Amino acid sequence: MEEKNYDDGDTVTVDDDYQMGCTTPTRDDCRIPAYPPCPPPVRRKRSLLGFGKKREPPKKGYFQPPDLDLFFSVVAASQAAT
């Protein structure tokens, strides 16, 4: 045993074996529990409309207005002029 004196007049008795006797608990009930595995990812809902599937062309054909080609030729000409 050793006595330590402090500046404020306090005296403390310290056991020499005190520092040697401190260890981390190793019992199973003192251990940090392992985390359980993560749950699986949430499954995506099935698409009702079938997005991403290749569609067939419409049975009646695509709508083709008669002046559509004229519109694009005017736009192309105006862009070429600038």
From Swiss-Prot:
Keyword Cell cycle: yes
Covalent S-S links between cysteines: none
Keyword Glycoprotein: no
Tissue and organ expression note: Expressed in columella cells in the roots and in root meristems after induction.
Compositional bias per record (Acidic residues), positions renumbered to this chain: 8-18
Induction and repression of expression: Up-regulated by double-stranded DNA breaks-inducing treatments. Up-regulated by zeocin treatment. Up-regulated by DNA damage and oxidative stress. Directly regulated by the transcription factor SOG1. Down-regulated by iron excess treatment.
Molecular function per GO: protein kinase inhibitor activity
GO process terms (BP): DNA damage response; regulation of DNA endoreduplication
Keywords: Cell cycle, Protein kinase inhibitor
InterPro entries membership: SMR (IPR040389)
Region (Disordered): 1-26
Protein task: Probable cyclin-dependent protein kinase (CDK) inhibitor that functions as a repressor of mitosis in the endoreduplication cell cycle. Acts as a potent cell cycle inhibitor, regulating a hydroxyurea-dependent checkpoint in leaves. Essential to activate a high-light-dependent cell cycle checkpoint.
Assembly: Interacts with CDKA-1 and D-type cyclins.
Descriptive protein name: Cyclin-dependent protein kinase inhibitor SMR5
Source organism per UniProt: Arabidopsis thaliana (Mouse-ear cress)
Gene: SMR5
